[in-house]
């Protein structure tokens, strides 16, 4: 039976885009796992298999993420992109790695908007193969985007607030008034606190 899976990569970083991806297939007859549990090399190898399946994705830039956080919420933005992906789905049944605390609420919203059978589950990227496949697409595409940004702006580490290298990069950029507007999420507390500390 044809099913689709949806997952995102890059929800939490202070630097770089978020990628939301969908994969659809009758069956996955090769090894997949939650992208976070795989090495980068393993993800890339599996990506070559997964990318041969029907898939769609969106790369969501920091400015759009900031705008959503200011006006509504990050969850609201993910709802919008999940809806867009579902409407492109080649199957009637879609599994989503749930980004809302309330699985049934998100299911209801997306079912009402799309008319499709939507099943939202926490840890679906770990437990459901088609969602694992989507997580690999999203993660590898985001990794590629991050490498492009590093080739322009220099090595900023992982882009996550917990990464000391990322924090040093941000602090250096703020002190030197470097133009990093296109890559940083200004609505993140990490960035706001650093800016506040150097006013």
Curated annotation (Swiss-Prot):
Its cofactor is Mn(2+); Mg(2+). Keywords: Cytoplasm, Endonuclease, Hydrolase, Manganese, Metal-binding, Nuclease. Its main location: cytoplasm. The keyword Amino-acid biosynthesis does not apply. It catalyses: Endonucleolytic cleavage to 5'-phosphomonoester. Residues 1-199 form the RNase H type-2 domain. Its EC number is 3.1.26.4. Gene3D superfamilies: Ribonuclease H-like superfamily/Ribonuclease H, Ribonuclease hii. Domain 2. Manganese or magnesium. Binds 1 divalent metal ion per monomer in the absence of substrate. May bind a second metal ion after substrate binding. One of its GO terms (cellular component) is cytoplasm. One of its GO terms (molecular function) is RNA binding. This is Ribonuclease HII. The gene is rnhB.
């Amino acid at each position: 039976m044809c099913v689709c899976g949806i997952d995102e990569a890059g929800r939490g970083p202070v630097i770089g885009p978020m990628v939301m991806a969908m994969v659809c297939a009758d069956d996955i007859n090769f090894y997949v796992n939650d992208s976070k549990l795989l090495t980068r090399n393993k993800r890339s190898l599996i990506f070559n298999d997964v990318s041969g399946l029907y898939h769609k994705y969106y790369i969501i830039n920091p400015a759009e993420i900031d705008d959503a956080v200011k006006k509504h919420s990050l969850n609201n933005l993910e709802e919008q992109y999940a809806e867009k992906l579902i409407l492109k789905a080649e199957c009637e049944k879609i599994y989503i790695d749930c980004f809302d605390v309330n699985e049934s609420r998100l299911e209801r919203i997306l079912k009402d908007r799309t008319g499709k059978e939507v099943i939202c589950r926490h840890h679906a990227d770990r437990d459901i193969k088609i969602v694992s496949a989507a997580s690999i697409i999203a993660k590898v595409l985001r990794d590629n985007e991050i490498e492009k940004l590093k080739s322009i702006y220099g090595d900023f580490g992982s882009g996550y607030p917990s990464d000391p290298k990322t924090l040093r990069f941000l602090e250096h950029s703020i002190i030197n008034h470097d133009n990093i507007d296109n890559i940083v999420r200004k609505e993140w507390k990490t960035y706001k606190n650093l800016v506040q500390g150097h006013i």
